[in-house]
């Protein structure tokens, strides 16, 4: 079964690039044609690049890696949080703070500060050691930290790879990943630079449906990698207990496997025994 179909790509508008006056000549090889002043992306290439990126993400996660999901533009914020959350991966969907990767130790301290503030009961003024004004200021600090760092609260170290929606907007994230040698997997619209991305997916990085589809595909690859990782652990007596979301993924996978196994058995009796003879008849004419 393919990771994604041509019909899904078309329905989601993955093939629509930018206006012809807004393009990067390095993207020429990914462009199929031009229509009404808009570049049309070659979806046959997109399909093969999706397969390549999917395999990389799956294998990276299967071997214990982490994928950081990054997309701070409005069209990407919801999909990034939802899909990363679905598979228990870290994400940044509000604002990229300089040094999130290259100065990770300092960022980790800010995450720790956020966790400390979360321990405060802001409703209990009398029981706290702070004044009303101090609590108000601390609450504002917490809200800001949660918006910027909430998605990476459980990221203990720099990620193994980064999934990026819109490499031009997220150029800081891409630059930091490149400095550290962290592979970037990203949607490449017709105005992007393919040299910045190790695993490109030529496609529309502006349409919500396109961003949703491709981010879900990457999350599916993560899910498959987690299942493979857990399968490898199952033979170890000292394996760590699964997180709730990991257990849900494994249960979904097992249910799908069971359905697929039942389907052929249910269909088998419906096949007519005379089918080969019926097929042979036209050849005798």
Swiss-Prot record:
Record GO terms (molecular function): structural constituent of ribosome
Keyword Electron transport set for record: no
Keywords, sorted A to Z: Ribonucleoprotein, Ribosomal protein
One Pfam family of this chain: Ribosomal_S2
Record's GO cellular component terms: cytosolic small ribosomal subunit
Region feature (Disordered): 231-285
Biased composition (Low complexity): 255-285
Cleaved signal peptide residues: none
Gene Ontology biological process terms from the UniProt entry: translation
Family: Belongs to the universal ribosomal protein uS2 family.
Protein name, as recorded: Small ribosomal subunit protein uS2
């Amino acid at each position: 079964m393919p990771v994604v179909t041509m019909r899904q790509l078309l329905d989601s508008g993955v093939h629509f690039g930018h206006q012809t006056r807004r393009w990067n000549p390095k993207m020429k090889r990914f462009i199929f044609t031009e229509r009404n002043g808009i570049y049309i992306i070659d979806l046959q290439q997109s399909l093969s690049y999706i397969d390549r990126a999917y395999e990389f993400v799956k294998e990276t996660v299967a071997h214990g890696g982490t994928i950081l999901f990054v997309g701070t533009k409005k069209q990407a914020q919801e999909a990034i949080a939802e899909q990363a959350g679905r598979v228990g991966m870290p994400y940044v969907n509000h604002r990229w703070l300089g040094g999130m990767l290259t100065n990770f130790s300092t960022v980790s301290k800010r995450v720790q500060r956020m966790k400390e503030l979360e321990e405060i009961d802001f409703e209990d003024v009398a029981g706290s050691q702070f004044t009303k004004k101090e609590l108000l200021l601390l609450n504002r600090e917490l809200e800001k930290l949660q918006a910027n760092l909430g998605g990476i609260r459980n990221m203990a170290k720099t990620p193994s790879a980064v999934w990026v929606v819109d490499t031009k907007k997220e150029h800081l994230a891409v630059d930091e990943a490149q400095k550290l040698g962290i592979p970037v997997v990203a949607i490449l619209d017709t105005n992007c630079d393919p040299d910045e991305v190790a695993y490109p997916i030529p496609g529309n990085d502006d349409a919500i449906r396109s961003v949703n589809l491709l981010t879900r595909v990457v999350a599916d690859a993560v899910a498959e990698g987690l299942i493979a990782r857990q399968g490898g652990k199952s033979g170890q007596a000292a394996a760590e207990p699964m997180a709730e979301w990991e257990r849900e993924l494994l249960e979904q996978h097992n249910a799908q496997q069971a359905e697929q196994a039942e389907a052929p058995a249910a269909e088998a009796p419906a096949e007519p025994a005379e089918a080969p003879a019926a097929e042979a008849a036209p050849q005798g004419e």
